[in-house]
Structures are given as C-alpha cells and as structure tokens.
C-alpha cells in the first residue's frame, strides 16, 4: 500500500509540475481568465511540495508582475504564489514583541507640526509577525521570521524583512502597503524585503 501511495504522489508531482509549466506560458488573456486555476495549481503544488524548475517559477512570477489588475481573484492567486515561494513553516514560534516598542516622532524640521516617522529600526528574530494585528509598522526589522498577512489595513514605513517566510491569505483587494509588499516579494528573488521610510 505504501508503495502505491508513493507512486501516486510521484504522478501527482509530475502532473502539477506540468500544470505549472503551462501557467508560466499563459498569454496575458489566459492568465487573466485563469486566475482561479492558477491559484489552485499553486496551492496544490505547495501542498505536494513540488519543486518546479527555476525558469518555470520565474515565468509564473513574471506573469504576476506583468499583470497589474486589482481584483480579489488576482490577490488570491498572488497569495498562492507567495506561499509557494516560501519554504515549509516551522511550528512553535512565539509572536514578535519588539514591533510594539517602535516609536514615531511627531515633528517637522521646519518647526511645524506633522508626522515624521523615525528612521531608527527595532529588530526581532525567529518569531511570528501577523501584519493584520498591527496595522501600522514603522522602523522595524525582522530576521528569519514568519510574516503573515491576510489583506487588512496596513501601513509600512522603514521596514526590513530578512530571510523570512511569508504566509499570505488575501481574499479581497488589498491596501497600497499590502500591494507594495506583495510585489516586492514577487520581484525579489532573495526574500529580503526593504520598505523605505514614508514621510
């Protein structure tokens, strides 16, 4: 029985890799019309731990970067791609705590009132950061963290994520900071993300 399951698993991986190759060569119209299929293929490929050739993965990434639409289907498929790119998630990480200690300075160089965000960065490591729980993150860095995001309201400024795992579950059109973060992940092959200070 075990041998049969391994054989079925092998066939499934081959099938899913072929589906990923097909998605990588979609025309813009096919990609737009097939977003739910793209999401399903990428979700299944992650679950089955399919390792597609780098040129296939890059071809699918390019589809997302090239195709700029703002629909729930697009962001759901984008979440599936980001999750596919991330390695398996380690269990038992505690929540990041340093993110709550980040300060925002309220002044302008000319003496007028206003909001200038601190350029100092507080760092954390090896923890879980749920972006939806914080809404605004300023001057924060995280190394080898799990970064979760479900598409809620979000403001990011002077933020660095280094060697992190990303878990996205976006089901609707996401705010600007969420879009920026998703695009950075899709275009950056290292997984190191830097969001500059916003004034």
Predicted regions and their residues:
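Solvent-exposed loop/turn tips at the surfaces of repeat/solenoid architectures
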Residues: 102, 119-127, 140, 145-152, ...
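Generic detector of low-complexity/intrinsically disordered segments
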Residues: 14, 18, 37, 44, ...
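Long terminal segments
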Residues: 173-199
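N-terminal domain-start segments of secreted/luminal proteins
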Residues: 76-136
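Terminal non-domain segments
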Residues: 1-97
């Amino acid at each position: 029985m075990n041998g049969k399951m391994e054989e079925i698993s092998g066939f499934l991986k081959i099938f899913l890799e072929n589906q990923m190759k097909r998605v990588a060569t979609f025309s813009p119209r096919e990609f737009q019309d097939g977003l739910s299929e793209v999401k399903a293929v990428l979700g299944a490929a992650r679950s089955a731990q399919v390792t597609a050739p780098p040129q296939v993965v890059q071809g699918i990434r390019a589809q997302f970067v090239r195709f700029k639409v703002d629909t729930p289907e697009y962001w759901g498929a984008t979440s599936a791609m980001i999750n596919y790119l991330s390695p398996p998630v380690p269990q038992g990480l505690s929540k990041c705590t340093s993110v709550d200690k980040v300060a925002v300075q309220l002044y302008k160089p000319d003496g007028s009132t206003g909001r200038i965000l601190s350029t100092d960065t507080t760092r954390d490591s090896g923890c879980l950061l749920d972006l939806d729980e914080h809404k605004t993150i300023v001057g924060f860095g995280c190394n080898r963290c799990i970064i979760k995001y479900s598409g809620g309201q979000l403001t990011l400024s002077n933020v660095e994520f280094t060697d992190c795992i990303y878990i996205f579950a976006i089901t609707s059109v996401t705010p600007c900071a969420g879009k920026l973060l998703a695009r950075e992940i899709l275009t950056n092959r290292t997984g190191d993300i830097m969001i500059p200070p916003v004034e």
